[in-house]
Amino acid sequence: MTKDIMLFVLFLAVLLLCAWPLGKYMARVFNYEKTCGERFFAPLENIFYKMAKVDPRTEMPWKEYCLNLIIFNALGMLSLFVLQLTQAFLPLNPQQLPNVETWHLAFNTAASFMTNTNWQAYSGETTLSYLTQMLGLTVQNFLSAATGAAVAIALIRGLVRKNTGELGNFWADIIRCTTRILLPICVVATLLLVSQGVIQNLNPYVDVQTVEGAQQTIAMGPVASQEAIKELGTNGGGFFNANSSHPFENPTPWSNFLEMFLILVIPTGLLFTFGEMCKDKKQGYAVLASMLLLFVLMLGVCYASEKYGNPIVAAQGISGDTAMEGKEVRFGIGSSSLFATVTTTASCGAVNSMHDSYTGTGGLVPMLQMMLGEVVLGGVGAGFYGMMLYVFITVFIVGLMVGRTPEYLGKKIEAKEVVLTIAGLLIPAATILTMSAVSCLTEAGQAGISNPGPHGLSEILYGFASGVGNNGSAFAGLGANSLWYNVLIGLAMLIGRFAVIVPVLAIAGNMATKKIAPANAGTFNTGSSLFAVLLAGVVLIVGALTFLPALALGPIVDQLFMLQGKVF
């Protein structure tokens, strides 16, 4: 236990130490200032601007920004859909894999990677060619991450600017994010992963003879380059079906630490970016403190539950007093619990252990974090703007308590912003619960359940929470590669992405037009520790009120049955 706690402390220390300078650098990038490597980046970016006939100096109001974003993402989804259905006729397919078997699986995968979800209802090494993995999935990993960051920055601009309707240039934001932030870090991360044993090649699969004399096929591929952006962009889709528990994706404890670090370094850095751009670092610190408070709480619950173990399994003398089922011995309870918490804290979804094998409360933590919108540090951009919706609700509640018009950063939070905030929070929640309920009541939905009882309900809840939350991890006992789940979870991913982005950009546009009022004696200090605690409380209360009944029938009952030694 001591080693595990030291790992947790070291991880947070390294994360914060690196996120601070990265956050300051990202502020310069998104303020359109010159950065290191300007002589290299500027000409490269100008090529893209000229190809697209875009003037990066032309700023956009929120509706134009949003329209460009939606059209760009729709075209990306369409291109990936077509690529999957034609890969058999294209190069870089040494295994001669056929086209993706059904249109609904291709639709689900295209929606998944475009929305930064990376839900995978297929096995990567037996379904997709190298070209589809590189030109399709990896490209969308970059672009979906850049899109999330662009929305977060547009919201920050809306909060800090005054008397204007402009939020920046969408094309400049995603290009600068990709060239100056994502690509440089990924190059370094790829080399580090290769040094640890992650494979990177375009070779055909290798047939070998095992020690027992049987034949085995070992998959090859350009894994390290995809692994880097998979984690850094909080995407999560694995090259292999086993994801980051596969030794070719995540071979050592050092690679495991690096992958967890990559998942959270940009989301954490964006809090420092926020403080820099609003000229008040305490605002960023307060939101970060609230996130860290929730993160430590969630990690503690997950780790304690897995460390305590499963008494039913322990009674058989199989794995001792800890819950090692579904976990890699090279990682153990500590690294597995930390990875599970990190990957669902962010909208990542990469896994180094099987979440379906976690105990009731151990699996509850990843599920609840996704249901809350993955706002505890969160994904690239998505975590920040998701948490800002809770910030607006907290400020609104505080305003009601003291009898003042709610204000944030000197701007009034009025009825229009509150309505948009509620929409951004309730539409995803309603989608999770409604689609889960319908799946439980239909034969097509029930056909995917491999475990009866409360755990079967947990698998369905987890699947739709993962889809709506744009996470992508799964309780893998759910048979998701069917017409029902491919279409429904595909729609859930689209709703979860754009039903939040559109209200956020609308809020940003409204806030940008307002003037900034100077603080006075009656202004609530949103940069204080009190506000950080209130914000964490609001996140938990909203989550409890919304999802507790469903969770009580799923993972909570699952845990109680386990403690009583009951199986189902």
Locate the predicted segments by residue.
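Membrane-proximal intracellular helices of multi-pass ion channels
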Residues: M1-F568
